[in-house]
Amino acid sequence: PEILARIKQHELAYRMQTSVPELMDLSGESDATFELYGEEARQAGSFAACCLNARRLAERGVRNIQIFHRGWDAHGNLAGEHGNQCKDIDQGSAGLIQDLRQRGMLDDTLVVWGGEFGRTPYCQGRLGKDNYGRDHHPRCFSIWMAGGGIKPGITYGRTDDYGYNIADADGNQLKPQPDKHKWTPGTMHIHDLNATILNQLGIDHRKLTYRYQGRDFRLTDVHGNVAHEIIA
């Protein structure tokens, strides 16, 4: 069985590599598609081109697709840097969602846009009018999701008035942030986010385990609740 598995692995690698030239050739895409994603989609390696390629990968059955976009770590010159970053990702992101919708793929595709932390509500650095930064802030941050059975056009969760801590529905700060041992509706711990994403992929986060150093682990540790309030 091990030899047969290795043979299949090499065969899969061959099929994947030989499919790349056709996948990356965007010459067959219509002008309307490039208008949707933006003219930068014609430029290889641009964020818009990556979004277009993400749709093409999804069409070919690729189950997990990740797009990277660097340059958000603005400890200085945040106003200029984040403004340019938003311009870079805006049309490509919107184009991807619209393209998936018009092709009937959005209901079966979950788009998650976010990072590993947010930025502090207070400034750092030179503190000039046009040149200031913000530090890392893992206590609370925002992401957005589209498709994949998630309710459109809603917001979920809130912070305190300073944007520093997670708060309950009445705006009261939660300690800890939030309590991963106690489910508080309207808030989302990172374990809850992972549990919800897995749920939309048809996976029960309580049953999915992997073995490491002789022990079974869950991606959500021993915590996590599915946020049914955001599921359509």
List the predicted regions and their residue ranges.
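Ligand-binding pockets and gating/stacking loops
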Residues: 1-232
